[in-house]
From Swiss-Prot:
This is Probable phytol kinase 1, chloroplastic. Pathway: Cofactor biosynthesis; tocopherol biosynthesis. Its EC number is 2.7.1.182. It catalyses: phytol + CTP = phytyl phosphate + CDP + H(+). GO terms for molecular function: phytol kinase activity.
Amino acid sequence: MAAAARPVDVVRHFPCSSSVAASSSLLLSRSKSRLASPAAAAASSMRRRLVLGVGAAAAPAVAALAASATPAALRDCAATLLITAGAYSLVRAFDGLTARRLIEQNLSRKIVHVLSGVLFMSSWPLFSNSTEARFFAAIVPLLNCIRLLTYGLRLSTDEALVKSVTREGKPEELLRGPLYYVIVLLVSVLVFWRQSPIGIVSLSMMSGGDGFADIVGRRYGSAKLPFNENKSWIGSISMFISGFLLSALMLFYFSCLGYFTVCWDLALGKLALVALAATVVECIPVNDVVDDNISVPLATMLAAYLLFGYSSCC
């Protein structure tokens, strides 16, 4: 009986032994493949040691800098990091929506156009009252300038970014409207900052006014302007209304925080004239020569300076 059972035992145990052999051969093949690229392993190890070494060397300097930094500098650094992360997340979120075809490319581009300026302005009170605060805030548009130059000059590629912020999906388009936009953000921070209504009104007209003009004009702009077939009556009216309302809202926001004074009985009429000037400039058929992201804020800055002055809205 025992002798008869042996073949059965062998049959039962044979698959297990074969699976073990297969597993062993698989492990050996993996080991061979790993050993087959010692250069890659050495490079990876070198990169790890380099990163750890740089981190270890920089840690004391970072700790010393943090210990010697003033509370205002720490606050400004934290605000810069937070806003930079928010700006990157905003663009990436609409990248994803565009890639999944949940939103049209042109609509995505203009929503990013509107939100970028509005959210950036709204975040300015996060910075301290130090004289250096504006330079920390300027880091955010400066990084975006570098990013747009990098992809616009094809030094690197980011197809999702290109699709979400350009009209035709071409990298070189990043060097026009989007780049002009962030340059205006940079200039507004460095020249006007929170103490002047000029930069705030200019960004409101560029982001909100021009942005809503395109959104509404594309959908409902069948009646074109007689002197510019690329612009519509409804789009221009939308720019005037949205730019005026957003400018008034942002002036109210910053005046409530005490950055400047607004005499509302005079300011609203002057603000309407500024919005009208920006709308007229946006209607002029010179977009092939001067981009709207340059002409609109420049016209707004000039009109606001003539009507308001530098530091008040009275």
